[in-house]
UniProtKB/Swiss-Prot annotation:
GO terms for biological process: Mo-molybdopterin cofactor biosynthetic process. Binds 2 [4Fe-4S] clusters. Binds 1 [4Fe-4S] cluster coordinated with 3 cysteines and an exchangeable S-adenosyl-L-methionine and 1 [4Fe-4S] cluster coordinated with 3 cysteines and the GTP-derived substrate. [4Fe-4S] cluster 2 binds at C287, C290, C304. It catalyses: GTP + AH2 + S-adenosyl-L-methionine = (8S)-3',8-cyclo-7,8-dihydroguanosine 5'-triphosphate + 5'-deoxyadenosine + L-methionine + A + H(+). This is GTP 3',8-cyclase 2. It holds the Pfam family Radical_SAM. The gene is moaA2.
C-alpha cells in the first residue's frame, strides 16, 4: 500500500473506545475506528470538464491528469466488484470532473449493474451532454442522476460556469426524467452575489417539474484556493432567502446518513408541493454519520474529501496484486479515516487536489 501526501496538516484520527486502531478488520463491512460504515462508493471517471465553474476550476490553465494514470474500464470494474462483493458497498455513484466525458461510462455502468448483489447506481453530472445519453445510460443500468445547476438565469449561469450552456442542461434534465432516471435531483452551489435570488427561482422551477433541489454549501475545494467563509452563503442564508416565498417545514422522516437536511415545501395554490434539501457541509457538518469512500480517476482511495493521505490502488492493480491485497489496502485506508474534515479548525489548510480531481 502506497500513501501519497497531499501537502496538508495531519488530522489525527482518535479512537473513542470502540476499536483498537492498530488492528484493521479483515472481514465484515468497511469501517473506521469511529464505527462508521462506508457503503457508498464515489467513483471519479475523469478530472476533465466542459464547464469552468468559478468555485471549482480556473477559467484556463488547469493541468489534466495524464491519460496513462487514469484507471481503465477493466480496472474500474475490478475495483467496484471488490467494493460490492467484499466490502459491503451498496451504492455506487459515478462522478468527475464531468463523467459524461468518459468514453467508457456506459460500459462501466453496465458492468456495475451485473454485480450481485446489485448496488444502486447513480451519476452526478453537469447535464450538458445528458440529453443524448440519458436513454442509453438507463438501458445500461443507471438508476438515477443528480444534475448540477446553480441558476436558471442564463446570464447568471454563464457567469458562474463561464459557458453559455444553460439550454443544454435544461434539456438534459428533461431527458433524464423521460428516461426514468428518477428521482432527478438538482445540485446547486449558490453564487454569493446572485444566490439569494437564484435559489428562489431554482426551487420554484424544480417544484413545477418534479425535480428535487439540493443546495450545497460551497466548500474549500476550488483549484484557485479563493474560498472564504465570510463570503460563501450558509444553509441559514439559504433558508432566510426562501422563507419569504415558501412555507417550509422540516421533513419528519429520519435523516439517517443522508447528507441533506430535508424540508417540506408549500409554494401556494398554483405550484406543486414538494421537498428540498440543504447540505450544510461547512456550517453544520455531518462527518459523524459519513458513509462514503472515494475512488479518484487515477486510482487513489480517499477516506474523506479533505483527507491528508491517499492510498494508491492503481499501483497495486498494475503491480499484480490479488483481490485479497487490494481489499486489505482499501480497509486500511478507511480504518484511519479522521473524525471530521477539519474545515472549522483554526489550522485548516485547503487540499492541493481540487474537487474536479477528487470527484463529488
Amino acid at each position: 500500500m502506497t500513501l501519497t501526501a497531499l501537502g496538508m496538516p495531519a488530522l489525527r484520527s482518535r479512537t473513542n473506545g470502540i476499536a483498537d486502531p492498530r488492528v484493521v478488520p479483515t472481514t465484515g463491512p468497511l469501517v473506521d475506528t469511529f464505527g462508521r460504515v462506508a457503503n457508498d462508493l464515489r467513483v471519479s471517471l475523469t478530472d476533465r470538464c466542459n464547464l469552468r465553474c468559478s468555485y471549482c476550476m480556473p477559467e484556463r490553465g488547469l493541468r489534466w491528469l495524464p491519460g496513462e494514470q487514469l484507471l481503465r474500464p477493466d480496472e474500474l470494474a475490478r475495483l467496484i466488484h471488490i467494493a460490492v462483493t467484499r466490502l459491503g458497498v451498496t451504492s455506487v455513484r459515478f462522478t468527475g470532473g464531468e463523467p459524461l466525458l468518459a468514453h467508457h461510462l456506459d460500459e462501466v455502468v453496465a458492468a456495475t449493474a451485473r454485480l450481485r448483489p446489485r448496488p444502486e447506481i447513480s451519476l452526478t453530472t453537469n447535464g450538458v451532454g445528458l440529453a443524448r445519453r440519458a436513454g442509453a445510460l438507463a438501458e445500461a443500468g443507471l438508476d438515477r442522476v443528480n444534475v448540477s445547476l446553480d441558476s436558471i438565469d442564463r446570464a447568471h449561469f454563464a457567469a458562474i460556469t463561464r459557458r453559455d450552456r444553460l439550454a443544454h442542461v435544461l434539456a438534459g434534465l428533461a431527458a433524464a426524467k423521460a428516461a426514468g432516471l428518477t428521482p432527478v435531483k438538482v445540485n446547486a452551489v449558490l453564487d454569493p452575489t446572485t444566490g439569494r435570488e437564484d435559489v428562489v427561482d431554482l426551487l420554484r422551477f424544480c417544484l413545477e417539474r418534479g425535480y428535487q433541489l439540493r443546495v450545497i454549501e460551497q466548500m474549500p475545494l476550488d483549484a484557485g484556493h479563493s474560498w472564504r467563509r465570510n463570503i460563501a452563503l450558509s444553509a441559514d442564508d439559504v433558508l432566510a432567502a426562501l422563507r419569504p416565498h415558501f412555507r417550509l417545514r422540516p421533513d419528519p422522516a429520519p435523516r439517517g446518513s443522508a447528507p441533506a437536511e430535508l424540508w417540506l415545501v408549500d409554494a401556494g395554490p398554483n405550484t406543486p408541493r414538494g421537498r428540498f434539501g440543504v447540505i450544510a457541509s461547512v456550517s453544520h457538518a455531518f462527518c459523524s454519520t459519513c458513509d462514503r469512500t472515494r475512488l479518484t480517476a487515477d486510482g487513489q482511495i480517499r477516506s474523506c474529501l479533505f483527507s491528508t493521505e491517499e492510498t494508491d490502488l492503481r499501483r497495486l492493480l498494475r503491480g499484480g496484486a490479488d483481490d485479497d491485497a487490494i481489499e486489505a489496502a482499501w480497509r486500511a485506508a478507511m480504518w484511519s479515516k479522521p473524525a471530521g474534515h477539519g474545515i472549522n479548525a483554526p489550522d485548516f489548510i485547503q487540499p492541493d487536489r481540487p474537487m474536479s480531481a477528487i470527484g463529488g
